[in-house]
């Protein structure tokens, strides 16, 4: 019999873990990006389909290799961003994702940080791909983006040239970009 104490996940986390929404790669994605953590092994790739005229996210999906909190955070993020402008999506915080899930145990905050990090990397990659930089997009990388880069560097040191998912579209692990 196990002596492990289960983490106090909310009913929403457990529901989205068992029945994730928008799971799977998106073949017609405008852009995608990945964020991962070698500390726990979690990886999230976010795919966005963008209405370029309206600058609005019309569809989002994800791939997740990780724990219940990782899958739930990516799933809820894809629901939250749909219908938002790119700028509105950029302003989403890891805390908002955690709150949408009914809270996460402190030891699992990094899961919502990874989801938001992948989102922000996808947004940056989108504008880099277009050769544009809107005035609201900060020059400096966010904490979530910096964490993703730190973790990718650690992966590279541990494993050499390494791509988490084997092929992101314009951003994420394994790319030569720094954001």
Predicted features, each with a name:
Residues 2-28, 32-33, 84-88, 92-179:
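C-terminal binding/interaction regions
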Residues 8-10, 17, 45, 61-62, ...:
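Broad hydrophobic/π-residue packing in well-ordered secondary structure
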Residues 39, 49-113:
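Active-site- and interface-proximal helix/loop "cap" or "latch" segments in soluble metabolic
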Residues 23-57:
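Structured beta-strand/loop patches that form or line metal/cofactor-binding pockets in enzymes
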């Amino acid at each position: 019999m196990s002596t492990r104490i289960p983490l106090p996940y909310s009913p929403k986390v457990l529901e989205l873990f068992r029945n994730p929404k928008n799971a799977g790669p998106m073949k017609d994605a405008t852009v995608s990006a990945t964020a991962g953590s070698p500390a726990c092994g979690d990886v999230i790739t976010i795919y966005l389909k963008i209405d370029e005229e309206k600058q609005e996210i019309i569809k989002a999906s994800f791939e997740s290799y990780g724990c219940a909190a990782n899958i739930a955070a990516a799933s809820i993020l894809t629901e939250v961003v749909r219908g938002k402008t790119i700028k509105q999506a950029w302003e989403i915080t890891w805390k908002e994702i955690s709150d949408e899930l009914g809270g996460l145990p402190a030891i699992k905050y990094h899961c919502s940080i990874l989801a938001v990090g992948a989102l922000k990397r996808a947004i940056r990659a989108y504008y880099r791909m277009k050769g544009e930089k809107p005035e609201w997009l900060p020059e400096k990388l966010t904490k979530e983006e910096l964490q993703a880069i730190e973790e990718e560097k650690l992966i590279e040191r541990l494993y050499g040239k390494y791509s988490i998912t084997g092929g992101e579209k314009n951003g994420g692990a394994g790319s030569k970009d720094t954001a």
